Amino acid sequence: SVSKAPVMFVMGNHDKPYDAETYNGCICIEDQIRTFRGIRILGLGGSMRYHPDAANQYTEKEMRRRIGRLRWKLKRNKGFDILVSHAPAAGIHDLEDLPHRGFACFCELIETYQPKLFVHGHVHANYGTGFQRVDQVGETMVVNAYDHYILEFPEG
């Protein structure tokens, strides 16, 4: 990476578990809150479960449980500034089919903590729907980072 910032990521629905060497210096923030330059970043990878035995796929109930296990981290960090997920939130950039449906519990996270930014992927521009890249939900800018999306933050 040519960036001076760390490269952080979450797992997608087709990703397999890797060993630390495979990350090649990148940081998996799955189920963590990482702080960089005072910015608190929460990571929740995976998608809605559409295949019974697949890794990184979750029912709504399973994703809620993951978030519930983070409650002490959320409290200790006084919330978060950026949510990074693979899947979208329900009703925001998602599709009606089960594999591309968003999580309602992400909407609740946004409503409760009002992060400045929610970055997700999973819904590709070439799916033929009315692809929406950026939305605003209350105080939260929602970005579908499919393929790539460049966000610049001021120094400091």
Model-predicted regions and their roles:
Residues 13-105:
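Conserved catalytic scaffold of divalent metal-dependent phosphoesterases
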Residues 34-38, 58, 107-113, 117, ...:
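Binuclear metal-dependent phosphoesterase catalytic core
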Residues 12, 41, 83, 118, ...:
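Divalent metal-coordination and catalytic microenvironments
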Residues 1-36, 111-112, 139, 143-148:
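Core catalytic region of metal-dependent phosphoesterases/phosphodiesterases
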